Amino acid sequence: MRVALLMGGVSREREISLRSGERVKKALEKLGYEHTVFDVREDFLKKVDQLKSFDVVFNVLHGTFGEDGTLQAILDFLGIRYTGSDAFSSMICFDKLVTYRFLKGTVEIPDFVEIKEFMKTSPLGYPCVVKPRREGSSIGVFVCESDEEFQHALKEDLPRYGSVIVQKYIPGREMTVSILETEKGFEILPVLELRPKRRFYDYVAKYTKGETEFILPAPLNPSEERLVKEMALKAFVEAGCRGFGRVDGIFSDGRFYFLEINTVPGLTETSDLPASAKAGGIEFEELVEIILKSAFLKEGVRV
């Protein structure tokens, strides 16, 4: 099997993608798969036809282009098989506003509004969360407890993104649920509870060793664990996700509040999905092989 490994990319998550890609590359080498690395940059479209000579594309491009449905649509058009969700599901999950509207009534979502212009005070009161519609790795996310912090968040995000989501802050326990697709169906890995040393699970907390305590499995009673897993899988399936992914949310007062779906989650040494896989008895090389094989679970290319 010939594997094209796509890493890097043009988004603000480029460095994380390179870290994920290097780790996947080493795993492919250990597994004995013939592979070629593509460090995706602005000129990638000139080279995309080269991918036709490979059996499958292993996509570890985080953020815009690689995770938002753009790459997936190109690969579908060219008839190239790839890991992860299709273009439609990727688009839905990358844009949080679209995700919330699409999943409304399916899972419980904290109150939210879209803001396109500067405001002096939060329409949802405090504390609240300000975040971009289309971004990953908690880039551009602010937890605000005052007008001053809220105004600062808008001044940072509005010029860059044009519009932002303001969401009610739910105090509780941060949970992430990783899901793999195998021949037997969807496998839900052990629920991971995140206890960041910082204010919340931001970029630094995600990718710096020692900044976040991983509790695996999350200390939940059987009914709580069942609820968290059921709600996460419900969101994943409703959004049409495939292959592998991660569902993030807040567990508070016996309820699971959905926050987002990551269709190309990080695979670095500090990432959530590999940690959950290991807790479930799946070492990293096996995880990579499961993700790779999931691309072949449907005949032809996803449509």
UniProtKB/Swiss-Prot annotation:
Q: Where in the cell is it found?
A: Cytoplasm
What's an example Gene Ontology biological process for this entry? cell wall organization
Known Gene3D superfamilies for this protein?
A: 3.40.50.20, ATP-grasp fold, A domain, ATP-grasp fold, B domain
Tell me which EC number(s) this protein carries. 6.3.2.4
Q: Which Pfam families match?
A: Dala_Dala_lig_C, Dala_Dala_lig_N
Keywords (A to Z) from UniProt: ATP-binding, Cell shape, Cell wall biogenesis/degradation, Cytoplasm, Ligase, Magnesium, Manganese, Metal-binding, Nucleotide-binding, Peptidoglycan synthesis
Its main subcellular localisation, reduced to a broad class, is cytoplasm
Catalysis performed (reactions): 2 D-alanine + ATP = D-alanyl-D-alanine + ADP + phosphate + H(+)
Cofactor binding note from Swiss-Prot or TrEMBL: Binds 2 magnesium or manganese ions per subunit.
Positions of Mg(2+) 2 binding: E260, N262
List residues binding ATP: 125-176
Q: Which positions are annotated as binding Mg(2+) 1?
A: D248, E260
**Its Gene Ontology molecular function terms?**
ATP binding; D-alanine-D-alanine ligase activity; metal ion binding
Q: Which GO terms describe its cellular component?
A: cytoplasm
Q: In which pathway does it act?
A: Cell wall biogenesis; peptidoglycan biosynthesis
Q: Which cofactor does it need?
A: Mg(2+); Mn(2+)
Q: Indicate the family of this protein.
A: Belongs to the D-alanine--D-alanine ligase family.
Q: What is this protein called?
A: D-alanine--D-alanine ligase
What organism is recorded for this protein?
A: Thermotoga maritima (strain ATCC 43589 / DSM 3109 / JCM 10099 / NBRC 100826 / MSB8)
Instruction: Identify the gene encoding this protein.
Output: ddl
